[in-house]
């Protein structure tokens, strides 16, 4: 950026030098008058035209240089602000991800993506039986929150949000029994893995909505093209979390500090703030298989989850959060 400023100043100084010699033009006119008396009008006219065209070319170059310098300044500002035109990385297969080193994956966004399948069948092609589900991965691609509409007298609707969390919201390494019945229906029960992730999104009006994206204790059943189940949504904050006034569920003050005595700390409007609620809630998810590969035991699909947001330990009414994305799993 400093080099761009220096180049701009240099060109501006050059432009001043070029425009300064007004006396040179008067001298040229006097020379033209003398030449006219000796019959040299044509040559002087050529000289004048040549000088004017050269001057126009030079000023044009100066103008272009100033534009280039301004563009360099704007480009430098974009670089400093961290602007990037790069999109999401190409989705890789499980084997391709495993073949990469840490430095090849670092900073690319691949670690936040679920693998895909190369080839395979467009349908669920696994035979009936009991399988061990491993390496299950749930990657959100869309977060919408049900909130009051911008239009007056309009009912609440799901609104698009802006993700405020870094690329750490994908659930991975989830395991559990997976059963395929003789009629083609499936059942999956989640037992272990990285099954929750704290996420914060921002509504168009600026309100931020934190929630715990999870599939904890999921029990989903149905046909491969749509099997649904409920799961547990733990409290966003634990019982030992203290609010700004030192109140907590299992520790801290019972009432807000500096409130007058006489039972005011237990008034109805303050109960939700004073009495912390860490009870879990329930969410629901629907999964669909889009491709399977029995040779490698891999299966992928899409999902749509509906769950409540954070309640600030019972002090706020939760919002409905709809999460859509893709999932991947291995059956052994």
Swiss-Prot record:
First-listed, main subcellular location of the protein, grouped into a coarse class: plastid
InterPro entries in the record: OMP/PagP_b-brl, PsbO
Expression (tissue specificity): Leaves.
Transit peptide: 1-58, 59-85
Membrane topology of the entry: Peripheral membrane protein
GO molecular-function terms, A-Z: mRNA binding; oxygen evolving activity; poly(U) RNA binding
Single Gene Ontology BP annotation: photoinhibition
Keywords, sorted A to Z: Chloroplast, Manganese, Membrane, Photosynthesis, Photosystem II, Plastid, Thylakoid, Transit peptide
GO cellular component terms listed in the entry, alphabetical order: apoplast; chloroplast; chloroplast stroma; chloroplast thylakoid; chloroplast thylakoid lumen; chloroplast thylakoid membrane; photosystem II oxygen evolving complex; plastid
Compartments (UniProt record): Plastid, Chloroplast thylakoid membrane
Pfam family, one: MSP
Note: PSBO1 is the major isoform in the wild-type and it cannot be fully complemented by PSBO2.
Function recorded in the entry: Stabilizes the manganese cluster which is the primary site of water splitting.
Family per record: Belongs to the PsbO family.
Oligomeric form and interacting partners: Interacts with CV in the chloroplast thylakoid membrane and in CV-containing vesicles (CCVs).
UniProt xrefs under PANTHER family: OXYGEN-EVOLVING ENHANCER PROTEIN 1-2, CHLOROPLASTIC (PTHR34058)
Record protein name field: Oxygen-evolving enhancer protein 1-1, chloroplastic
Native source organism of the sequence: Arabidopsis thaliana
Gene coding for it: PSBO1
């Amino acid at each position: 950026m400093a080099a761009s400023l220096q180049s701009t100043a240099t060109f501006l100084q050059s432009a001043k030098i070029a425009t300064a010699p007004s006396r040179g033009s008067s001298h040229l006119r006097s020379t033209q008058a003398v030449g006219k008396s000796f019959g040299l009008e044509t040559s002087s006219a050529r000289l004048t035209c040549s000088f004017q065209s050269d001057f126009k070319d030079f000023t044009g170059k100066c103008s272009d240089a100033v534009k280039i310098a301004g563009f360099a300044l704007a480009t430098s500002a974009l670089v400093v602000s961290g602007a990037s035109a790069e999109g999401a990385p190409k989705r890789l297969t499980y084997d391709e991800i495993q073949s990469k080193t840490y430095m090849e994956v670092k900073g690319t966004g691949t670690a936040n993506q679920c693998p895909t399948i190369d080839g395979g069948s467009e349908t669920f092609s696994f035979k009936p039986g009991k399988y061990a589900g491993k390496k299950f991965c749930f990657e959100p691609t869309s977060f919408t929150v049900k909130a009051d509409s911008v239009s007056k007298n309009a009912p609440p609707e799901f609104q698009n949000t802006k993700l405020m969390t870094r690329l750490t919201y994908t659930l991975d390494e989830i395991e559990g029994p997976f059963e395929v019945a003789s009629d083609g229906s499936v059942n999956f029960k989640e037992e272990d893995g990285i099954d929750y992730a704290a996420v914060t999104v921002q509504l168009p009006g600026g309100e931020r909505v934190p929630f715990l994206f999870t599939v904890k204790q999921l029990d989903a059943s149905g046909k491969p093209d749509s099997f649904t189940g409920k799961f547990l949504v733990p409290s966003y904050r634990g019982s030992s979390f203290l609010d700004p006034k030192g109140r907590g569920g299992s520790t801290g003050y019972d009432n807000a500090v500096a409130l007058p005595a006489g039972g005011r700390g237990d008034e109805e409007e303050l109960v939700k703030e004073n009495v912390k609620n860490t009870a879990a809630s329930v969410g629901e998810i629907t999964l669909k298989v889009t491709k399977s590969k029995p040779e490698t035991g891999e299966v992928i699909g899409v999902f749509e989850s509906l769950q409540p947001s954070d309640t600030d330990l019972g002090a706020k009414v939760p919002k409905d959060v709809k999460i859509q994305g893709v999932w991947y799993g291995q059956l052994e």
